[in-house]
């Protein structure tokens, strides 16, 4: 489809023109949502050197593509360097990413570390390798970031990844914890950002098809198909199919926490709670006949199609990149 982007209008059929039109709309939407996430969490600042971790999957390809586009419009300068970790998985095509990145003219670094052999030696056959593999990969990328002088490490996790992590922690870890758009690395030395935090996965699937990224399969290691994360992801997809808007409601709830109506004593001083004699907007609702399935019950903001829809005025003030 890249040919459709570059070809003159007169040479396109109506069907091709429609594909190009839809692709351009998608590109603008992804750029807009990425810009909002960057602005909301102050992910990128003037003079930053952003290390984009490129795996060869659709998400990291899209992240690099969008950041390169946004950099052209940004009111300040920042550098981008793409980094791939070749873990020596069987069947990994070592030429694909260097050829692609060279064609873009973007600086890149390929780090070769045989973590695959370590994982297969330590983890018994048939057991999940993802956790150990992830820890090894993370440590290597932190080291590379320091060697390259990167001030930000950009990962390609999207909205559905954040939701899946939340439910995994909820179902199997007993804690309300997700995947933050911005955090400090485990070693305390690096800032990790997720600019695609507001982007749903189905948009990235469509974008990869439109841009014809040279996708490298993600299951070269023989990862198991019944992983808990994949099960949770299927649950979220089924929700979207049967109950449109439900996953967005849950996602938006992650940024609308009311500590006084939860049970974490570290977040709210329940022990010291006393009547003040003044009305409280977040006060007692224990006896209110609220039906959470009733759209009339103050659900307007919660049903926004994206995190920015309910706060458009604030977003206009906070966006640091030029409007697209």
UniProtKB/Swiss-Prot annotation:
Segments for region (Disordered): 1-26, 278-310
Superkingdom is Bacteria
Major location category of this protein: cytoplasm
Q: Compositional bias (Basic and acidic residues) at which positions? A: 14-26
Motif PP-loop motif, per the record, lies over: 55-60
Where does it reside?
Cytoplasm
Q: Which Pfam families match?
A: ATP_bind_3 (PF01171)
User: What GO CC terms are in its UniProt record?
Assistant: cytoplasm
Does the record carry Ion transport as a key word? no
Q: Which cofactor does it need?
A: Mg(2+); [4Fe-4S] cluster
Q: Which CDD domains match?
A: TtcA-like
Q: For this UniProt record, give its keywords in alphabetical order, as a comma-separated list.
A: 4Fe-4S, ATP-binding, Cytoplasm, Iron, Iron-sulfur, Magnesium, Metal-binding, Nucleotide-binding, RNA-binding, Transferase, tRNA processing, tRNA-binding
Pathway involvement of the protein, from the record = tRNA modification
Question: Which positions are annotated as binding [4Fe-4S] cluster?
Answer: 130, 133, 221
- Which principal EC class is assigned to this enzyme? transferase
InterPro entries assigned: Rossmann-like_a/b/a_fold, TilS/TtcA_N, tRNA_Cyd_32_2_STrfase
| Matching SUPFAM superfamilies | Adenine nucleotide alpha hydrolases-like (SSF52402)
Family membership: Belongs to the TtcA family.
Purpose: Catalyzes the ATP-dependent 2-thiolation of cytidine in position 32 of tRNA, to form 2-thiocytidine (s(2)C32). The sulfur atoms are provided by the cysteine/cysteine desulfurase (IscS) system.
More about this protein: The thiolation reaction likely consists of two steps: a first activation step by ATP to form an adenylated intermediate of the target base of tRNA, and a second nucleophilic substitution step of the sulfur (S) atom supplied by the hydrosulfide attached to the Fe-S cluster.
Q: Subunit composition?
A: Homodimer.
Q: What is this protein called?
A: tRNA-cytidine(32) 2-sulfurtransferase
Q: Which organism is it from?
A: Bordetella petrii (strain ATCC BAA-461 / DSM 12804 / CCUG 43448)
């Amino acid at each position: 489809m890249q040919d459709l982007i570059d070809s003159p209008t007169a040479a396109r059929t109506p069907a091709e023109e429609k594909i190009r039109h839809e692709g351009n709309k998608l590109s603008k939407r992804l750029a807009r949502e990425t810009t909002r996430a960057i602005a909301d969490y102050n992910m990128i600042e003037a003079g930053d050197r952003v290390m984009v971790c490129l795996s060869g999957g659709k998400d990291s390809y899209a992240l690099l593509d969008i950041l390169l586009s946004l950099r052209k419009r940004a009111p300040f300068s920042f550098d981008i360097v793409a980094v791939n970790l070749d873990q020596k998985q069987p069947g990994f095509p070592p030429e694909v990413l260097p050829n692609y990145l060279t064609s873009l003219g973007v600086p890149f670094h390929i780090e070769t570390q045989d973590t695959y052999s370590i994982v297969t030696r330590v983890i018994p056959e048939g057991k999940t390798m993802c956790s150990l593999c992830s820890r090894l990969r993370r440590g290597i990328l932190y080291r590379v970031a320091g060697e390259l002088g990167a001030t930000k490490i950009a990962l390609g996790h999207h909205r559905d990844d954040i939701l899946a992590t939340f439910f995994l922690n909820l179902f199997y870890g007993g804690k309300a914890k997700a995947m933050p758009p911005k955090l400090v690395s485990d070693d305390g030395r690096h800032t990790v950002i997720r600019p695609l935090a507001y982007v749903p996965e189905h948009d990235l699937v469509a974008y990869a098809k439109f841009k014809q990224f040279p996708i490298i399969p993600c299951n070269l290691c023989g990862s198991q198909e019944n992983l808990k994360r994949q099960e949770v992801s299927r649950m979220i997809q089924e929700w979207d199919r049967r109950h449109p808007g439900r996953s967005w409601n849950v996602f938006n709830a992650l940024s609308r926490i009311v500590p006084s109506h939860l049970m974490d004593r570290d977040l709210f001083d329940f022990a010291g709670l006393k009547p003040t004699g003044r009305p409280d907007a977040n006060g007692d609702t224990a006896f209110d006949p609220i039906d959470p399935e009733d759209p009339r019950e103050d659900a307007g903001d919660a049903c926004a199609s994206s995190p920015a829809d309910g706060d458009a005025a604030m977003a206009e003030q906070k966006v640091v990149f030029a409007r697209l």
